């Protein structure tokens, strides 16, 4: 039997005490760190999904542009090479707490965004390309994907900010020391970068 203040408690009373203790701990934020950790990881997965979606659109986009503007080989090559680097960058399991790996991923995606932006500027010189039905369909898909990338990045920024704040403040800092010593602050995109890097899809 469980003894409380000198009084022995039976099975039912003991169960009630354990439930109340659990609710008290939950109310004090014992589960907040793992909950925010999962939310940040889910947001990161969506970021990866949307960047991959963009990468999947690029080969068809390049081929379509090439059909109307083959002389723009320099810009087309830049896009192809930037895509290759972005899709080949290593994503280790600890990327969210690995500053170097996160930085390399970020740089690769930013380079691809820059190359795409330069390609879209070139497109302005070719009215026939801008009216091509296949290109219009790709334009719509790319525009939607860029919007989803922006949303996914913003969601990740917020999720990581909440998680990192919990690790630094009380009571999260206490729970981290007691129960989650392996929890580390996560890397994040900067808000200013998020607003400047995504290419604008306007034709």
Which role fits each region the language model picked out?
Residues 2-4, 9, 16-203:
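A helix-centric hydrophobic-segment signal that preferentially recognizes long
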């Amino acid at each position: 039997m469980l003894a409380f203040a000198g009084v022995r408690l039976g099975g039912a009373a003991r169960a009630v005490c354990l439930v109340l203790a659990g609710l008290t701990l939950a109310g004090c934020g014992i589960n907040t760190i793992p909950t925010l950790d999962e939310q940040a990881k889910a947001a990161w997965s969506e970021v990866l999904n949307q960047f991959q979606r963009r990468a999947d659109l690029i080969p068809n986009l390049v081929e379509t542009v090439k059909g109307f503007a083959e002389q723009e080989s320099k810009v087309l090559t830049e896009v192809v090479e930037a895509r290759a680097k972005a899709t080949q960058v290593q994503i280790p399991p600890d990327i969210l707490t690995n500053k170097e790996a996160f930085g390399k991923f970020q740089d690769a995606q930013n380079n691809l965004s820059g190359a795409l932006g330069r390609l879209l500027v070139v497109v302005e010189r070719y009215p026939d390309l801008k009216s091509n039905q296949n290109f219009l369909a790709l334009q719509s898909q790319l525009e939607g994907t860029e919007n989803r990338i922006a949303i996914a990045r913003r969601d990740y920024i917020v999720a990581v900010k909440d998680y990192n704040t919990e690790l630094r403040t009380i009571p999260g800092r206490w729970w981290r020391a007691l129960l989650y010593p392996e929890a580390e602050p996560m890397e994040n995109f900067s808000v200013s970068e998020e607003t400047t890097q995504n290419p604008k899809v306007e034709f």
